[in-house]
Amino acid sequence: MTKQLLLSFLALSIGISQTVIGQEIDSTALKQLEFIKKVTYGMGHDLFKTRALPYKIKEDYVAPWEKLSNSNMENLAMGLDTIISNGSIAVEKGHFEEINVVFSSKVEGIENLDDIFTIALVAYTLFDVNKNPIRLKENARTNFGSISNSGIKNGQAFSYNYRTIKSAFEIESNKDTLGISGTVKLQASFPSGYDKVVITPKDIGKQFTIGLKKYEVLNVFNNIIILKPDSKNENLDRDFDIVNLNAKGDEIAQIAYFDLLKMNEGKEKPIEMIGVGTQTISEKIYKIFTENPTISKEEFDVIIDPIAKKIFSAEDIRAEREKQFGQTYIAITNAGPVENCYLYLEKRELKRAFEKEF
């Protein structure tokens, strides 16, 4: 009788899984196991090792919630109504000869429009001249511009400064757009606020909620933050964005690759580029590297191999894997030392759905 072995006991830490058929682990499976151990060790070693941190300070940084504070909610709500009433829809050819359904509009008095306005395709029913259905790509390419003028008309001074919006949805089927007919339903929105939390090196043990998910700050060291998700969280998806600020509110940002190359010129030991973002790490792997950040690959294998044997010999592979490797944590890697790391989540409660007809 064959038995499926899920070669994924490390999936909690690196997201790799492999199915192996048979009672015994064959040579191919062993090679895959060695590869998984190598990748997992490399990930843990890279996360916990002491290193120089190449980063830059962006003094002109303005946080998203500060940009939003420049426009009050009443003004934004009126702006949405204006965008919809001024809006029109047409078929246009793009820069790369693609054919697009384009929503165009204009509005005055909205600061940071480029940063805060979004538009989404809700639904559509479109046909060509022969009544064949037309399909659209769902993601819009939105460009912003401006139109301004001033002068005197009929003895009265006038002045206007419009921001323009052009959102293009590419037609991906039936490029014959002559006689296109139908309706497009869109949703335009502005953020209504931000759910945010700040994490500093002093916040180990801090519990917080962002969006609908709860976390605990398990550790903060160098440029790393380790979060322990609440077991009741729906999933491990990272819903929040991240920015690390110094005491002045400047961004501690990732250095550009070519700037790093210039920085490393003439150095015997070049500074490594650091990947900024989040990754998952299992409780067991975290514990191994916390207790011994400089553990060698050989020492790592001595710990992992007996665990692998227990998992492969268990009746319930998945349950044993979870038992051996424990909960999954989230590791946040910043470009520079953690000072004031903001996790923030945009709220888009200010939105309007509307239809345009061909």
Predicted segment positions?
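Bacterial Sec-dependent N-terminal signal peptides
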Residues: M1-S27
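Alpha-helical, hydrophobic structural elements that either
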Residues: Q23-F358
